[in-house]
Amino acid sequence: MPDIKVTPLGAGQDVGRSCILVSIGGKNIMLDCGMHMGFNDDRRFPDFSYITQNGRLTEFLDCVIISHFHLDHCGALPYMSEMVGYDGPIYMTHPTKAICPILLEDFRKITVDKKGETNFFTSQMIKDCMKKVVPLNLHQTVQVDDELEIKAYYAGHVLGAAMVQIKVGSESVVYTGDYNMTPDRHLGAAWIDKCRPDILISESTYATTIRDSKRCRERDFLKKVHETVERGGKVLIPVFALGRAQELCILLETFWERMNLKAPIYFSTGLTEKANHYYKLFITWTNQKIRKTFVQRNMFEFKHIKAFDRSYADNPGPMVVFATPGMLHAGQSLQIFKKWAGNEKNMVIMPGYCVQGTVGHKILNGQKKLEMEGRATLDVKLQVEYMSFSAHADAKGIMQLIRMAEPRNMLLVHGEAKKMEFLKDKIEQEFSISCFMPANGETTTIVTNPSVPVDISLNLLKREMALGGPLPDAKRPRTMHGTLIMKDNSLRLVSPEQALKELGLNEHQLRFTCRVQLHDPHSDTDTLSRIYTHLKSVLKSYSIQHVPDGTVIVESIVIKVTSSAEEPNLKVILLSWSYQDEELGSFLSTLLKKGLPS
């Protein structure tokens, strides 16, 4: 039996370094190639030794697909292609292709130029890697080769994020990457058609969370920021360059304008300009409201939000700063946090998920003393708030996607083991499908039922529909009767009449014959007349004919009477019928065996 194998090289019962290997129909596809922000050694990269022991991946992989530009999904791409060795195609959407190299270069500068780390990719490697990228359009079916095809769907989450359907023959897999089932201030909700894949591989970051009202969260966020600046404190909001940053900037910009507030709001230098450029360039990826108003008013040109200079961090008085990256693991956000952590007037608001090992994760878990580089200890006195503006699907959203796609099997990645276990049970109970949650390096094998596509002739379809009843769908299948014709390796279901005509054949008639013996003193003609009268009284809804040639006809059934030569009173009744009337023929033979009424 054919099967599909799925092996997480990263993000198996874990969040970070997303990298899923899928083997389907003899093809090997790598889904995402991310980096783990909680590690500073080789553990930050996926373990490619599961694929091959002798280095290069080109001979093994048919293609690599990147779902979006976040570093936990694309951060290891130059390492994989240029240092381990891969020359094949890398697929991603146009916005991801544009933004991905900028974020990779920013992270490389922090890691290599500032921290002095070795065994890391260079600027040239990023450029060489991006030359291998093939851009994807939404809903466009791309033929990777003669057998493998891929198709991208809108995922929300961040600009350019996509879910991907992979098909080889009749087998298919859908990989969600990160997605969001609710629209926000700048992006739409994820959408996929009822593609019924053999496996749906879904993220499960918020596997046990059902978020409260977005409006309540926004109100709480604005209240906390306002209260902090009113008492003279500083607010740090760690964000990733594109995504939640724009969402919260639009929110604060509107609030500052309405309340006529004067406290300065800053954003990491350069990133606002870049964000603005890409949102203009890829306006079709934003939500309907922004697309409609973009010509008159660009939502991303902020009046109250200015570019940040590192010297501003020491300025007295209140301020709000959006700084990257979002998990406080490096860069400007971490530098500002170190400066402001000692003052209880200040506040840090964490708007998204933080992986284990990052400073963000530590302070959210209540750590008040942090060991920094060089064995220095940092006392955390500022207020720490977690407000989920994360653009990941919650438990409700994941269930909604399953209802949309109707997969035959489910596989969870990109989440914490305990939470995944809870969601796994819920999915199996509600949808009666198998759900898997493999750890890193663990292979899940799913046996598929090969389906054979069949074209149905229009005439046959019209005839079936004329019979009435509900239209067929996945939950209410309908049996269709016809003749299968195989020609040029394709199958068609047609009516038997059409099949005979196309093949130039004559229809054969299959008939059954039955003899019934009956004692009757009357002549053969009288006996036949009595049979006719009896059948007329029993079969009131049928057309019954008494033909002059000495036969009675009911539908296709022919009845004749002859006498036995040895015994004139013994009549032999001969019944003959076609296979369509087999049920009626059996009924009549049983009826006549009981005799005729006197």
Swiss-Prot record:
Motif (Nuclear localization signal): 470-480
BP terms from Gene Ontology: regulation of RNA splicing; RNA polymerase II transcription initiation surveillance; snRNA 3'-end processing; snRNA processing
The EC number(s) this enzyme carries: 3.1.27.-
An MF annotation (GO) of this entry: RNA endonuclease activity
Broad EC category: hydrolase
Binding locations of Zn(2+) 2: 72-73, 178, 414
Domain of life: Eukaryota
InterPro entries: Beta_Casp, INTS11-like_MBL-fold, IntS11_C, MBL, Metallo-B-lactamas, RibonucZ/Hydroxyglut_hydro, RMMBL
Subcellular location field: Nucleus; Cytoplasm
Hydrolase recorded as keyword: yes
Cellular-component GO terms for this entry: cytoplasm; INTAC complex; integrator complex; nucleus
Nucleus listed as a keyword: yes
Required cofactor names: Zn(2+)
Binding site residues for Zn(2+) 1: 68, 70, 157, 178
Primary subcellular site in the record, as a coarse category: nucleus
Pfam families the record matches: Beta-Casp (PF10996), IntS11_C (PF21386), Lactamase_B_6 (PF16661), RMMBL (PF07521)
Keywords of this entry: Cytoplasm, Hydrolase, Metal-binding, Nucleus, Zinc
Catalytic site: 203
Primary role: RNA endonuclease component of the integrator complex, a multiprotein complex that terminates RNA polymerase II (Pol II) transcription in the promoter-proximal region of genes.
Subunit composition and interactions: Component of the Integrator complex, composed of core subunits INTS1, INTS2, INTS3, INTS4, INTS5, INTS6, INTS7, INTS8, INTS9/RC74, INTS10, INTS11/CPSF3L, INTS12, INTS13, INTS14 and INTS15. The core complex associates with protein phosphatase 2A subunits PPP2CA and PPP2R1A, to form the Integrator-PP2A (INTAC) complex. INTS11 is part of the RNA endonuclease subcomplex, composed of INTS4, INTS9, INTS11 and inositol hexakisphosphate (InsP6).
Family in the record: Belongs to the metallo-beta-lactamase superfamily. RNA-metabolizing metallo-beta-lactamase-like family. INTS11 subfamily.
Listed name of the protein: Integrator complex subunit 11
